[in-house]
Amino acid sequence: LLHIPSLPRRFTVVGAGVIGVEYASMFAALGIEVTVVDKRDRPLEFLDRELVDELLHQMRNAGVTFRLGETVERLEVVEKPSRHVVVSLESGKRLVSDLVLFSAGRIGATDHLNLSATGLKTDDRGRLAVDHEYRTSVPHIFAAGDVIGFPSLATTSAEQGRLAACAAFGIDT
């Protein structure tokens, strides 16, 4: 996405989380027709509803279309007459786009950590449960970042790691 040769006329973003909304805003500011698709009825659920409502209002005014409560069924690249992507939704709607960004979430990368040897269990998305100090159910094991889930952002993960390390070594934060 950072190395596209030219700007698209139509841009579809699958996923209305932080990354999806950020890129949708940037491309809309460039005058590009943007559609955001998300299976949830409300994007950015962790933010105050009034803030999200205002953000959506501003984004709609900038030309962004939201297809909330929709699930992508299929993506099809069509080569002729010009290369584009057809995004088919489970509702039967079809979106035609020049560029698609898939930013519909992360899963914890825990498959190869041999967690069974530790007694730790993950949820259905591979995430570990932690307390306020990032301590797992095994008292001497801490976890941070994508393996604990929300929000899966690099800066947040770095801060979680710092706090977990401080807790592990008994350092006040």
Residue ranges of each PLM-predicted region?
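FAD-site-proximal beta/loop scaffold in flavoenzymes
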Residues: 1-8, 94-172
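Rossmann-like NAD(P)H-binding beta-loop-alpha module
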Residues: 5-39, 44-47
